[in-house]
Amino acid sequence: MEFTPPLQQGILLRRYKRFLADVQLSDGSEITLHCPNTGSMRNCLYPGETVWFSTSDNPKRKYAHTWELMTTPDAGLIGIHSGQANTLAEEAINKGIIKELTGYDSLSREVKYGDENSRIDILLQGAQKPACYIEVKSCTLLEDGQGYFPDAVSLRGQKHLRELMHMVSQGHRAVLLFVVQHSDIFSVAPAAHIDPEYAKLLKKAVLAGVEVLAYRCEMSPTEIHLAQACVVRV
């Protein structure tokens, strides 16, 4: 996915009220960005470092600028826009980058499924194949060289694991796909120290037949895309 128009940059001052962040531009002026990330963004905030943001020409938006990337102190990059994970996953599936998810005829987004009033991120269907239900999660939490998910207690994430297990019990294929938007994460594990129930459910889901995949993003201020598989430690 290319960033069009090109991203602009500034210096992070602060994130607050969950969905807002103030940055300083090169001329010394300050603007407020929309922060499209519902998580805690634990270990992803580096005041004084460079951020990259997009700008919308929609006059109805209260905040025209959206935070896209965060530069780390060691010159790495973090994808802040967690909502882009589904788009990145769809793009990678269509291009055949995710080898485990090739060979299907159709791809649908946000289809109702399960018995807990959920919508699946991606549904793949093909002739003479079980339907494949894919939940996509953005992973950005890095601690002691290990990537973790979630970065806060996630009741929604727990629900999605239950839904995936239900799909397997109905004879379908179910996949949990971690989209790694942190250049220094090379393996992903459940954050049992943050959400022990999620970690417990993930192990149960794997035993029930849910597949878990993780793919790293290649990121730059000009584009972002899924590039290669990485290790999942359940």
Swiss-Prot record:
CDD domains: SfsA-like_bacterial (cd22359)
Pfam families cross-referenced by the UniProt entry: SfsA, SfsA_N
Gene3D superfamilies xref list: 2.40.50.580, 3.40.1350.60
GO molecular function per UniProt: DNA binding
Family: Belongs to the SfsA family.
NCBIfam families registered for this protein in UniProt: sfsA
PANTHER family per record: SUGAR FERMENTATION STIMULATION PROTEIN A
Name this protein carries in UniProt: Sugar fermentation stimulation protein homolog
Originating species: Shewanella baltica (strain OS185)
